[in-house]
Regions:
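Structured catalytic cores of enzymes that bind and process phosphorylated ligands/cofactors
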Residues: 15-16, 29, 73, 100-105
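Short phosphate-binding loop-to-helix
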Residues: 25, 31-90
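Residue-level signal for alpha-helix termini/capping positions
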Residues: 17, 63-67, 96
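Conserved core of the sugar-phosphate nucleotidyltransferase
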Residues: 83-172
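N-terminal glycine-rich phosphate-binding loop and ensuing alpha1 helix
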Residues: 1-28
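Short, high-confidence coil segments that cap the C-terminus of an alpha-helix
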Residues: 21, 68-70, 97-101
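Donor nucleotide-sugar recognition loop
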Residues: 172-180
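A conserved hydrophobic position in a structured secondary element of the catalytic/binding core
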Residues: 28-29, 83, 160, 179
Length: 180
């Protein structure tokens, strides 16, 4: 999809590259996306079509191509053209500083419509979000549910340490994940 005369994936790729967080790869089973990225001068790797999650796809690239490097691997969704490079950098910095094995990002909702929008993933937490600490997520969901806890807009980016990623892909999918 073109946004400002540029494919969506290229906006995401440029943000990831501008974060100066390390090598950027597009992992996809879609040859058209691979061609777009490579024509732009980016790195794209064709992955299996059989993955159940994006994290499984990222692990395939990590396992086959990165020789157990780097220590933190970021899974960034390809349909997020507005992701800021600072957000990517901040996730990695916080994970390193706080020795977190897994991290993700969330933000305040910009409107009530976002809370009711089933296309926007919500994250439920007990504490207010701030820049200086990570919070433990209680749940992630799409539909607006009544909660006595605090809800934020989940941003589709995940960071894993090498060890956590290797463990995560071996886990069985949870009942909640399968239901959704």
């Amino acid at each position: 999809k073109l946004i400002n005369n540029k494919e969506m994936i290229l906006h995401v790729y440029e943000s990831a590259s501008a974060s100066n967080s390390g090598e950027v790869f597009v992992a996809t089973p879609n040859q058209k996306i691979i061609d777009v990225v490579r024509d732009f001068g980016g790195k794209a790797i064709k992955t299996s079509e059989n993955h159940k999650t994006g994290t499984d796809r990222v692990f395939e690239v990590f396992e086959k191509n990165l020789n157990s490097e780097p220590n933190i691997i970021v899974n960034l969704q390809g349909d997020m053209p507005n992701i800021e490079n600072k957000a990517i950098s901040k996730l990695i910095e916080h994970m390193k500083k706080n020795q977190c094995d897994i991290g993700t990002l969330a933000s305040n909702f910009s409107s009530k419509n976002e809370i009711d929008n089933p296309n926007i993933v919500k994250v439920e937490v007990k504490e207010k979000l701030n820049d200086s600490k990570f919070l433990n997520a209680l749940d992630f969901f799409r539909n607006n549910k009544v909660s006595k806890n605090i809800l934020y807009h989940h941003i589709g980016i995940y960071g894993f340490t090498r060890r956590a990623l290797m463990m995560y892909v071996k886990l069985n999918r949870s009942k909640l994940e399968l239901e959704r």
